[in-house]
Amino acid sequence: MNWLVYIFWPIVKFITFKPEIQKTLKVTTQNSDKISNNVVSAVHSIGSIILNMLYFLTKSNNIISLSFLYSYSYFVYDGYLIAIKKNVENYPYMIHHIAALVVLEDINKNINRDLLLYLYLLAEISNLPNYVIYHILKINPNRDLKHAKLLQMIWFSFFRVFIYSLYVKDCFKNIDHNLTKLTMFFIYFAGAYWTIGQFKGVYTSFSRKTIKSS
């Protein structure tokens, strides 16, 4: 029955193309596929956060199994879409997805579960503003979101750089599998790299305003 989870994501994507949903999301023919993918990704992130928080509250094996299948199926599904569409700009996400699958495998096998799941939960929480800002920019590219982008950068860097930095020593000492250990350090440095990218974007947004005013 586990295979049923894998058809969940195509169903979610299909629902996003229904006229009433597209009207609500203010989707146009030019941005429909990207907005649809963003919504599917947001559904995964929110669902994953809820399931993982429930696990920490209950320590239920059923919940952690569902959480594993929920996230594992999403990364396989999205990786498949990236592969068949051959969109080079999305290839880095393939590496990210493979890294996530490595971590999820250890979580599912109860290897350093609490540490890995906690860091995985933080990573999903750090992504939440990204979906909102991406959606707004897709439906209104000219909207000034420099302050929202600043808050996004602060939010993301707090979880993915500051909080993650507090667990570098724990990851180095306590994670059993070397591949998982390397994967976690990759995720940490990827977060730092994305933070730098966000900082550059925020700096450019505020600089552009300053130039126009002068």
Give residue spans per PLM region.
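Membrane-helix and juxtamembrane interface regions of eukaryotic multi-pass membrane proteins
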Residues: 1-122, 127-130, 134-214
